[in-house]
Amino acid sequence: MCSSDLNNGSSADAVIIMKKGGQIAPTFYLDDFYPWFCQGISIERIARRILELNQQHQPEASFALTDEVHDYQKMRTHVCYKLINYEMNRSLLSKIPHIPYLDLAIVFYCKVTAPNLQNGSFLIHNSNLTAWNVSTDDLIRDARLNTCRKLPFCFKEMDALIRELSNDESLLPSEFSPNSMYILTNQETYFGAAALLYPHVLSHISALLGCNFFVLPSSVHECILVPDFGVYSKPELEEMVVEVNSTQVAKEEVLSNHVYYYDLKKQELSL
C-alpha cells in the first residue's frame, strides 16, 4: 500500500500489486472501496475483491515495457499531453517537463495500450528526459501527433449529450439558440480538456458556430463552449465556474477557475 500523488496537490491511499520483475500494474484507490466498508462489508471480502480485480486487469504475460521504457525511440509513439492547473501544481511541475499555457501547464505522459489495462499511463518526469536524452521540444512534437490520433476530439451540443446519456428518445433535439452550450473533450473523456491544444480544432469550431466563444474549464476531462451572442458576460460565467468547481468537481479534477475567450478573427484563445 502507498500514498499516491494526484493532480492539484491531492493524494490518496492506494494498493498496487505488481508481479516480480513487472514494470506496470493497475492501481486501486481505497476511497473507491470505502462505501463498501460503510455498508458493513468485511475487510476480508474487500481484500478478496481487490485481488480479483487485480488479476482481471494485470497485463498479459506477452506485454512488457522492460526494454521499451528505456528507449525513447520505442516510447515516442506513446507520448501524449494533458492540461493541468499551473498554480495548484507548482510542486509537481518542479519535477516534470512542462510548458506554460494561459494559467495552465501542458504536461506529458505515456499512454500504455495493452489487454486488460484501462487508461494505463505514467507521467513523464525530468528523470525520464535525462535517461532518454531528449528535450521538452521532442515531447511536444511527438505528443501533438500522438494525442490527436490516440484520443480524437469529440464536440457535441450539451443537450444532445444529455439525450445520449439518458437514452430517452422522448427528448427531441432542440433548435439552435443563443443559449446553446457545447462540450469539447476526447472520445475517451480522459483528460479531454487537452483537445483545446489540438491543431485547428478551435478555429474549425469557431467557423462552425460563426462567432467568438467562451471556454469554461469544466474539469481536466472536458470543457464547455458557450457562443458569445451577448447573452452571458465573462464575470457571470466565471462565477458559475467557481461555484461548480467548489461544489461539484473533485479537487484532483479541477482545471481552472478562469474563463477563456476564443476570438474568431484573431484565431486566438486568451484569458
Regions found by a protein language model. Give the residues of each.
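Short acidic-glycine loop/turn motifs at beta-strand connectors
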Residues: K20-G21, P227-G230, Y262-K266
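Extended, low-complexity regulatory regions
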Residues: A12-I17
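A contiguous, surface-oriented mixed alpha/beta subdomain in the mid-to-C-terminal portion of proteins
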Residues: L92-V241, N245-Q248
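Helix-rich interaction surfaces within compact, conserved domain-sized segments
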Residues: E243-Y262, Q267-E268
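Sequence-structural signature of the catalytic-core scaffold of metal-dependent phosphohydrolases
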Residues: S10, G21-L30, W36
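A short beta-turn/loop motif at secondary-structure boundaries
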Residues: L6-G9, P217-S219
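Long, mid-chain structured domain cores
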Residues: Y29-I124
